[in-house]
Amino acid sequence: MLERLSQRQPFRSALMSEKDRAMAARWAKVLGIGVVVVAAGAVTAWALTKPQPHEAGYWSSVGQADLAKGEQLFWAGGCAGCHAAEGAEGDAAKILSGGLALKSPFGTFHVPNISPDPKAGIGSWTLAQFGNAMTRGVGPNGEHLYPSFPYGSYARLSAADVNDLYGYMKTLPPSSNVEPPHELGFPFNQRLAVGGWKLLYFDDGPRVELASADDKVKRGQFLVEGPGHCGECHTPRNALGGFEKGQWLAGGPNPEGQGSIPNITPGSKDIGAWSEDEITEYLSTGFTPDFDSVGGSMVEVQKNIAHLPKSDLQAIAAYLKAVPAR
């Protein structure tokens, strides 16, 4: 009996071994499929969230920069409001040395030097590097830029617009000032995550559809939604910093934590009741219809935008009266 059992044992052991090998093969197949799926997901995620500059040929189509148009875009964009020294006036407002610290729920962003200085500023950048930073949020080394820089609005500038602006900015005084790095905690200090933010919120299309807009309103739409980047402050945001859908220019909490930013749609209790002429006057002089004056962070905005021709201020006013009331 014992002899017969001992003779069967090798067969049983061999049988179990075959089962083990079959199970191991199945697990290996499952794990292999899992690895492929994870790898494919990682590749897809990278493809969707990687920095996406314009094609190189996009910038080669421009000709000589129109410096007068570039200056208008400079003032419309409020470049001096963030990149010049606080309170700078006259020619000092054209020294874009950086220095402003923007406090947000995500940390503190230090506004950089964008003067023509080749080391501390952007003087060594090519048009493509400048343009991709402005309109795609991609830095000179191919990195994501944080959306504290409003490239989501500047994305509406054409290649010619960017060329004109950069041409003008290269005529401004250089500065050797060097700003400290941003002060952001994890995970906001990971630029890779910005690619996911762009996937969710970066959009270069119209913020609102205005089917019956005339040329004046269309010009105002370009100025407000594009270089003027009015929505960056006047539109409420969600927890991830994206615009609240359907609330364009409806106002909301001050992103820097103090007070609120007003509603500037026709549904506002204040500016909503103003006429186009009154809005134009406010943008030009800083005085409201009640003879009050502009205050807070809007002081710097109004000071910059007042450099625009009256026709542009009228276009902005027409657009603000045309957007949906909120």
Go through each PLM region and give its residues.
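Electron-transfer interface patches adjacent to heme c in soluble/periplasmic c-type cytochromes
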Residues: 99-131, 152-162, 247-288, 301-314
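Extended surface/linker regions that mediate inter-domain or inter-protein docking
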Residues: 32-46, 157-221, 236, 312-319
